[in-house]
């Protein structure tokens, strides 16, 4: 599964590791988990003035629709209170409910520091791509 910050980064920089990751997902190289919480966050963040000024609404809408329609929707998220940033606990709940192998994030301050949560490895996009020999 992929942290919302990775999805936003992919939208903002079409030539980047997050964008390459999204291409691999679209090619069916891995499954993507999502939840209504993540979709809500994605819609909210793409409307921030500092993001909206750098991002085409059409491009943002396309990715949101793709994630909603093609990702595996995880429901019945457990209550989780582990992350130093309480706003990220829903990502750990998604990982738990969806039995995710990986949680890919750029959050060095909070999520990457955890390294592992209930069997889910928490790593950077770069580490994931290197591990799977998918670097561009």
PLM regions with names:
Residues 98-101, 108-136:
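Acidic, PIN/NYN-like endoribonuclease modules and their adjacent C-terminal/linker elements
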Residues 69-103:
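Active-site neighborhoods of divalent-metal-dependent phosphate/nucleic-acid chemistry enzymes
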Residues 24-78:
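PIN-domain endoribonuclease scaffold, especially VapC-family toxins
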Residues 4, 36-37, 106-108:
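Short secondary-structure boundary segments
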Residues 24, 94, 114:
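Hydrophobic/aromatic ligand-binding patch that stacks against planar heteroaromatic rings
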Residues 1-34:
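Short, well-structured N-terminal submotif of metal-dependent ribonuclease cores
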Residues 7-8, 40, 110-112:
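Short, active-site-adjacent cap segments at secondary-structure transitions
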Residues 11-12, 46, 115, 133:
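Short, flexible helix/strand-to-coil boundary loops that buttress conserved ligand/catalytic motifs
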